[in-house]
Amino acid sequence: SDEHLLIVDKPSGVLVVPAAGRSGPTMVDVLKKQLGRPVTAVHRLDEETTGCLAFAFSEDARSGLDAIFRDHTAIRDYLALTTAVPSPESGCIESNLEEGRDGIVRVVRRGGRRGVTHYETVSRRGRGCLVRCRLETGRRNQIRVHLAALGCPVAGDRKYGYRARSGESFPRVMLHSSS
């Protein structure tokens, strides 16, 4: 951290900001209490996703960081443990994404918002693998939807296609924001 911004390692199971119909402390609440000063989330991570999360201490810092994210110049890398190997093992997924009334984000032919995820297989083990994903855009559940569309859902992601196999147990969506 410095006088303008703070990067934290977000744990699983914590919302970044308040959400309708949900209660409990958010990352913003926890940081305000710990630091004794206001903070603003610059971007969001899904509740179950762990890893790097940026906060701004001032409106100027938030505005500057917003511009970096809006212009897609922020490097946003994630690591995902998947239940199958993507084919091809590296590439770019580009599709339009739209959230339905049921809260599920889907790939759509018309409408929606453009989502672009670059991915590469880092290592393989059994039927699954570790995949590095770099976001070009940042849509809700983008990596989870894109990997599921490739036939290799993120381990533990029951919302987007993960089905437990015998002897397999993942306590959460196995997705981590690494930068």
Where is each model-derived feature located?
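Generic signature of intrinsically disordered, low-complexity segments enriched in small/polar residues
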Residues: S58, H72, L81, V122, ...
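RNA pseudouridine synthases
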Residues: S1-R106, R110-V116, R124-G126, M174
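Pseudouridine synthase
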Residues: S23-M27, L31, E99, G126-S179
